[in-house]
């Protein structure tokens, strides 16, 4: 199929913080709290909660941790009110960057995000300065395994409403519209498939190739952002050098 997901290129460069399983669970737990407060604690009637639970399971979040987050949000346990904010700006060499934040203190978050940008030669911009370069898409990543037929999986995904299907080195990447993400994900789940990733994210229309010096600076920026408890997601359009390692 047309297009390139760049999943491995970006996934491999997500930063040291993403290797900290507890931090990932904390961030997803905050997403669960927001989803429940917006649509209620029942996944059957709350599509956003279903999506976040799928993301949690793809990250191997224990069921009891998921349930605790749901109870927390539904008032059975003390829950914090979070504000959702997206910051936009430019990394080194003009890399377009979006930063999603869930915070109980937007002044703290704004200061921390601005510091991460400026420390590595980037700058925070105004709303809309780079978001037009991205589209909201569903992305489902499935590990290649013996017995999993590529053609069958592709037809299964496309029949369920997927927009695109990519075969990469070790994974298959299914792309969907934001609207059809839940339908496609549930159809694949019904076939017994497990996901390495299943979430709606901002995907760049085009990627910008960067050299090793820029990659080193930008990775430091990503590490600072992803180590911030308020930062939920960081999206960018950088294409790291082939074989580049931090």
UniProtKB/Swiss-Prot annotation:
User: Which Pfam families would you find in this protein's record?
Assistant: TACO1_YebC_N (PF20772), Transcrip_reg (PF01709)
Chief place where the protein resides: cytoplasm
The transmembrane residues are none
The entry's localization annotation reads: Cytoplasm
Q: Which GO terms describe its molecular function?
A: DNA binding
Q: Name one GO biological process term.
A: regulation of DNA-templated transcription
Keyword annotations of the record: Cytoplasm, DNA-binding, Transcription, Transcription regulation
**GO CC aspect terms:** cytosol
Family membership:
Belongs to the TACO1 family.
In Swiss-Prot or TrEMBL terms, this protein is called: Probable transcriptional regulatory protein CLD_1467
Q: Which organism is it from?
A: Clostridium botulinum (strain Okra / Type B1)
